[in-house]
Amino acid sequence: MDPSWATQESEAVAEKVLRYRRDASGWKKCREGNGVSISWRPSEEFPGNLYRGEGILCGTPEEVWDCIKPVASGLREKWDDNVSSFEIVQSITDMLCVSRTSTPSAAMKLISPRDFVDLVLVKKYEDGTISSNATHVEHPLCPPKPGFVRGFNHPCGCFCEPLPGDPNKTNLVTFFQTDLSGYLPQSVVDSFFPRSMAEFYPNLQKAVRKFHH
């Protein structure tokens, strides 16, 4: 993959995801509980929804980030049941790569195993926020794989934000807009994302405690 194209494309995605973070309009709450709020609005990228999750975790932004950062043999595979494997297909810079993520079947096997090939950019902001920003790409080393339906992540990502006044806590804001493809009933998709995003937060909290405390 051409590094200059990848750099340009990933920066455009990061701008878009930052815009989602700053734009408070049009979100409809669909799930709330245990300090986690999930909301959605129609996606501008595909005929589906953009989902937003927000919750406060015990742990510094670095500790939270360590459990979710996109690296080969990272912690994410160890604790996240929604990720069966994660590999780096091409490392472009320290902060930019192409990854392939495999996910197991879900929703009582209504959703069969998926794989996703993404361009992923990590950004660090002056206030201490660490973000990941991703979108789907095609890559010659990632042809369709038997046994997996290829899904497509439209611009998505997360922000590990320092909590003012409490250096040991992190405000985690996540954005998903994923085309699972493969002829799924819309009702299955609409119920799956809010639920899996809501479960992600307590599972991540357990991982932060396990690996960092």
Swiss-Prot record:
GO terms for biological process: cholesterol import. InterPro entries: StAR-like, StARD5/6, START-like_dom_sf, START_lipid-bd_dom. GO terms for molecular function: cholesterol binding; cholesterol transfer activity. Residues 1-213 form the START domain. Gene3D superfamilies: 3.30.530.20. PANTHER family: PROTEIN CBG07384, STAR-RELATED LIPID TRANSFER PROTEIN 5. May be involved in the intracellular transport of sterols or other lipids. May bind cholesterol or other sterols. This is StAR-related lipid transfer protein 5. The lineage of its organism: Eukaryota, Metazoa, Chordata, Craniata, Vertebrata. The gene is Stard5.
